[in-house]
């Protein structure tokens, strides 16, 4: 499993409830760009539109070798492939309980297919974010202290 892009900001801004794997519909030029590692999920989000699930605002850069006929839209909507039951479950959670769906990473699986890891998440408050930062800082200090005693 080769990870192409990771959304680090999502782990800071949201508390993850459940993770899902989804296939993604891409053009050939997009796959070539992903193999070169030219993807960014920083501002991306997932929406369910007419019982289909889409990854929006994800950035896949163009390669300089791509012919103008085959160029793709860099920030276009990309359809995600999931089972109907999974989509219905996500739709119920998002519409009723106030959760959101976040893209965590893009990767190539063992069969060289591009997959996306999605997460059902709930937004963190400012207090929760500060607590996360404090915990991270404490872990770093503990590691540094352990390193000195070796």
Swiss-Prot record:
- Function field: Required for rescue of stalled ribosomes mediated by trans-translation. Binds to transfer-messenger RNA (tmRNA), required for stable association of tmRNA with ribosomes. tmRNA and SmpB together mimic tRNA shape, replacing the anticodon stem-loop with SmpB. tmRNA is encoded by the ssrA gene; the 2 termini fold to resemble tRNA(Ala) and it encodes a 'tag peptide', a short internal open reading frame. During trans-translation Ala-aminoacylated tmRNA acts like a tRNA, entering the A-site of stalled ribosomes, displacing the stalled mRNA.
Which InterPro entries does the UniProt entry name for this protein?
A: SmpB (IPR023620), SsrA-bd_prot (IPR000037)
Q: Does the keyword Cytoplasm apply?
A: yes
- Drop me one GO molecular function for this one: RNA binding
The GO biological-process annotations, alphabetized, read as: trans-translation
**Could you state one GO cellular component term attached to this entry?**
cytosol
Q: Which UniProt keywords apply?
A: Cytoplasm, RNA-binding
Annotated PANTHER family = SSRA-BINDING PROTEIN (PTHR30308:SF2), TMRNA-BINDING COMPONENT OF TRANS-TRANSLATION TAGGING COMPLEX (PTHR30308)
**Compartments, record wording:** Cytoplasm
- Protein encoded by which gene: smpB
Q: Which family does it belong to?
A: Belongs to the SmpB family.
User: What is the name of the protein in this document?
Assistant: SsrA-binding protein
